[in-house]
Amino acid sequence: MIGNWNYGTGRRKTSVARVFIKKGTGKIVVNGKPVDEFFARETGRMVVRQPLALTGHLESFDIKVNVIGGGETGQAGAVRHGITRALIDYDATLKPALSQAGFVTRDAREVERKKVGLRKARRRKQFSKR
């Protein structure tokens, strides 16, 4: 805990989010912008609010997020992971519910590298028998 802020780091794909939460009115600020402005798609905003909705703290915390790297989906997932860890830092009794929903586990899926001689990671050149 830093002062009266609780901290959590979240990661997803190539995105990293640093999340600070404190008791407040429910404001979520991502990279200096309100969450509704930062995430253009509704799915991104929904993903960010999932841990708060699950624990019933949707209007209880002010959240400040700094997120770098990746795209919109990766950043939303990183913010969700960070908020989850910050909530656990605030109150460890929330961990079982968050674990049950699968928010505590870091999604380890990464982009597979392109291999030499192939078009993409697994896509080969079309085979011609004749």
Swiss-Prot record:
Keywords: Ribonucleoprotein, Ribosomal protein. One of its GO terms (molecular function) is RNA binding. GO terms for cellular component: cytosolic small ribosomal subunit. The keyword Isomerase does not apply. It holds the Pfam family Ribosomal_S9. Coiled coil: none annotated. The keyword Glycoprotein does not apply. It comes from the Bacteria. Belongs to the universal ribosomal protein uS9 family. This is Small ribosomal subunit protein uS9. It comes from Bordetella avium (strain 197N).
